[in-house]
Amino acid sequence: MVSKDQTSFNKRWTLGLLMLGLVIILWVLSSFLINLIFEDDSYRKPFFITYTNTAAFIFYLFPTAKAVVVNYKDTGRANVHRELIMEEEGTGSDSNRSVDMTSPLLTNLEAGTHANQKKRLTLYETIKLSAEFCILWFTANLVTNASLAFTSVASQTILSTTSSFFTLFIGAICHVESLSKSKVLGSFISFVGIIMVTKSDSHQRYQRHIADVSGDDNDAVQVLIGNLLALAGAVLYGVYSTLLKREVGDETRVNMKIFFGFVGLFNLLFLWPSLIVLDFFGWEPFSLPKDPKVVVIIFVNCLITFVSDFCWAKAMLLTSPLTVTVGLSITIPLAMFGDVIFKHKTMSALYLFGATLILGSFFIINKSSEEEHFENSITASNYESVEVPAANN
């Protein structure tokens, strides 16, 4: 029986890692696409693009909308609330059954407590959570997209993947994560790497434009702004992840499709006035894309965001949030490789060393977290072996 549980657990964990790999590829591809239309000023509209991408989450509600239409044709009543509850509770029941039938380890990857003791979020609680995190989610993605208008994809990717560094300390402040010497050491090494990458990228861009007569002396400042925006995105991701974990606890307690669907709906309904404000003050003049290439890129990027965020949520359920966050550091060499291949960029020794430090810091943090996860898994397994016979009696 134990062997079957372990085999099933390994299969689900492997599936989670495969989905994480897909997320990594899609996120880097999305960064290159956005950078492509920002770099040549063909359509530098970070707010509108982020608004469109986030609004695309509303398609997660389409299966429920379809069920409402079918129910209306059959009974003459729409009953939207009933269909939403069925989607929320029905998916939740299947999800919980799947976890119970495979391994108790899946429900105790982070907290070390028994997930079945926690009640699943109701429909109202899920919608409320979506409303609370809509602005924070949107702002995090906005500053990340905006950073691509000023800095390289490689630098943006490296700085964005430092989110685990901020998640660790913000989580410790909120009593969500525990600090250890290994985690602090890894975070310090990551911080040193950030300084090296930022300094190298700004210096290289500045030197290229000093040599170019038509270059702008302020370009180094723009690169620094881009790096700071990417860093701000990492901080906001850390805040978002920590607060979400504190509110939800176990990620299996929330239906991610309903959650993301209402994030998209609230974004669509409440953030459109910002487009008017940005246009009025001239910060981002509103205009729809006219170039077919830009239209295709924006559409493809919407699809990428839609698919990658679903895979990201599933990967978190199949593995653990920390595993996913640390695993996203693989985007660093992938983005750097893309810059070398597609843009023929050269990486300085300082840049490469800084990137190596950041990547190495994640291995240190991951090793420490893995040991904690193993201890929590053993505790959960022992708890399950005691509770199940008691329940049968």
From Swiss-Prot:
Residues 1-17, 68-132, 177-182, 241-257, 314-321, 367-393 are cytoplasmic. The modification Phosphoserine is found at residue 93. The keyword Chaperone does not apply. It is a multi-pass membrane protein. Belongs to the TPT transporter family. Present with 2010 molecules/cell in log phase SD medium. This is Uncharacterized vacuolar membrane protein YML018C. It comes from Saccharomyces cerevisiae (strain ATCC 204508 / S288c).
